[in-house]
């Protein structure tokens, strides 16, 4: 089995359906004997340029190890699902399990906000 990185963008009005979509896609990978190495839901993000007059989309990143049949099935599913605006499937040489730069930046912002809150609370006392 080969390793793949999959990113898909979902219509912002369909954001509530994303958890079900993720469950369905990861289920099909696992049923075929594949593995999910990394799964990140980046949430709604601003697009670099409008797609179908939309300026935001819900992003999901998956790193999987799966047979080619599953990848072909996912491609077909993405193609015929109107909620998926764009998708990309890239074959990688090895499994990627570390957090993506998007998640690292988000965690750093969260940590710095907590430090600022603690400093503010200390200043009040």
Curated annotation (Swiss-Prot):
Compositionally biased tracts (Acidic residues): 116-125
Record Pfam families: Ribosomal_S6
Endoplasmic reticulum recorded as keyword: no
MF terms (GO), sorted A to Z: small ribosomal subunit rRNA binding; structural constituent of ribosome
Compositionally skewed regions (Basic and acidic residues) per UniProt: 104-113
An example Gene Ontology CC term for this record: cytosolic small ribosomal subunit
Keywords from the UniProt entry: Ribonucleoprotein, Ribosomal protein, RNA-binding, rRNA-binding
Alphabetized InterPro entries for the sequence: Ribosomal_bS6 (IPR000529), Ribosomal_bS6_CS (IPR020815), Ribosomal_bS6_sf (IPR035980), Ribosomal_S6_plastid/chlpt (IPR020814), Transl_elong_EF1B/ribsomal_bS6 (IPR014717)
PROSITE patterns associated with the record: RIBOSOMAL_S6 (PS01048)
GO annotation, biological process: translation
Record region (Disordered): 99-125
UniProt entry tagged with the keyword RNA-binding: yes
Task of the protein: Binds together with bS18 to 16S ribosomal RNA.
Family classification: Belongs to the bacterial ribosomal protein bS6 family.
Protein name: Small ribosomal subunit protein bS6
Gene name tied to this protein: rpsF
């Amino acid at each position: 089995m080969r390793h793949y990185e999959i990113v898909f963008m979902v219509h912002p009005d369909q954001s509530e359906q994303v958890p079900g979509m993720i469950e369905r896609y990861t289920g099909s990978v696992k049923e075929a004997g594949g593995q999910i190495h990394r799964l990140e839901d980046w949430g709604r993000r601003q697009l670099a340029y409008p797609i179908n007059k939309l300026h935001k989309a819900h992003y999901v990143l998956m790193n999987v190890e799966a047979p080619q049949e599953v990848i072909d099935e996912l491609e077909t599913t993405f193609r015929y699902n109107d909620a998926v605006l764009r998708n990309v499937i890239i074959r990688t040489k090895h499994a990627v399990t570390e957090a993506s730069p998007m998640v690292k930046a988000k965690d750093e912002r969260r940590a710095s906000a907590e430090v600022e809150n603690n400093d503010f609370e200390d200043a009040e006392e």
